[in-house]
């Protein structure tokens, strides 16, 4: 296993990222490492990597449109109005107790936004560049550790789709998990349904809830001050700006936001939704048509890093899939070397973690592992619920805490608006510790005792 191209390339990726090497460069080096160890050769590796870059183009374009839309919203003044209302509320009730409760209220609201983005209004991470940046000044005043915010957002983006069969959860549970497990277990007498999957995933999700509570109330509870180079606007400055905001600007912003999300839900396209929102802003006079170029340029600057990471991650995943590493990794578990039931469960979960971090998608991991995991679990005597839990957790592991995952890139896109939130150390590492470790522990417990 230690000579497997997937394992080594993931180790290289994580090591370089932790050394603060740019994530894009780390992904390129990790891809070259995987190709070299996987015997693809330099030329074939480069061709495979570049051939896979197009797979991330749509996501990068989505980020660019969202960036432009976020800039347009800020021009409308609605974000300043929200900040003003919150700041004046804070100034009226400045006691430590009230500020603490207010901090946790913000956490709860952000968690609800994130959960809704997966299940109720499945817009995924599209809400983050719109909702989070206006709150940064509030975070600074409250001295909130943004790592806690990253953990809150990532929890909502990951925990709910593996538990609740609604929205993206319906796709993951019903269309992918249940379907693939039933196909793999058809000749083995194992058939499952949505209710069983939700039951099997309940204990692992409880582990994630404990990880979230640990992050909020223990690890990142203490105040954290950020070195802000630009002097933040005072309440009087904001009041002067608020006085110039017209009611039609607020109405236009609300219409644009609703229209954007509604269009995305109907068309399943963030690009079309964002364009509709921008058109509404132009028609309502929030910015002139000739200013659209500046709006897009600012949006690109805002989201360029995130978009290029997704493009590079797509090329890296293409190289991983071109090697035999993923198949070898999964099949190594069925070689008969492992005799202990507990060790087998742990190894299956760890392999799932590596695969998901390698190909960047828990949704894509399920079809890869089920054909081996289902018969392997049954041969070790795992119950149907335990088998479901192993497959589900093995796929979900690595979604949170991966340098190239939407679940970490999304929070970074909003929290790093002012350049004070490091993607690796402030998003990746905190979410990896607080979610992947509990998922491993509680996933193993579920496998052994369900």
From Swiss-Prot:
Q: Where in the cell is it found?
A: Cell membrane
Q: Topologically, how does it sit relative to the membrane?
A: Multi-pass membrane protein
Q: Any idea which UniProt keywords this protein has?
A: Cell membrane, Membrane, Transmembrane, Transmembrane helix
Cross-referenced InterPro entries: AA_Transporter-Related (IPR052576), Na/H_Antiport_NhaC-like_C (IPR018461), Na_H_antiport_N (IPR032813)
Mind naming one GO cellular-component term on file for this protein? plasma membrane
Per the UniProt record, which residue ranges are transmembrane?
10-30, 53-73, 95-115, 120-140, 148-168, 199-219, 242-262, 267-287, 302-322, 343-363, 378-398, 428-448
Taxonomically, the superkingdom here is: Bacteria
User: Major location, coarse class?
Assistant: membrane
User: What protein does this entry describe?
Assistant: Uncharacterized membrane protein HI_0325
Q: Which organism is it from?
A: Haemophilus influenzae (strain ATCC 51907 / DSM 11121 / KW20 / Rd)
